[in-house]
Amino acid sequence: AYRPVANDRLNALASYTWLYDMPGADQVNVDGNVNGPKQRSHILNAALSYDLNQQFTLGAKYGFRLREEAARGTNTFITSTAHLAILRLDYHIVHNWDILAEGRAMAYPKADTTEFGALLGVYRDLNDNVRLGAGYSWGGVSDDLRSLERDREGLFVNLIGKF
């Protein structure tokens, strides 16, 4: 993480996840499915945000997933990759209120497929550590590379804690 105290105009965060989701009989996978597939995944993420001025913040995220997936009850794994790109703009309206717009693209090179999505939301800072938001998501592209399912489109409510 790069989050300077003296000048936090630019913030960066990178992460690596090793997901070993090999549920046995009657156990759920990461998506909560009893009969869903099992997976082994390496996931890399990098996110940046930059304050253009006091009202606008530009954000970007890139994610990469290398996954091995098999149907429940088999050990025949299929390897695939995915690339996630997100571009986001936050607008600080007035004290404690923000609007955000986000565009998303998820590319699956092996399948020669790219999916697109968008998100609009309104957020309210309840205090220094809690933010509540609501909005609408189009296109079904999730920012969670652990998931094996498409994200659902529609309304969402989001509660964020920051420390």
Regions found by a protein language model. Name each.
Residues 1-163:
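Gram-negative and organellar
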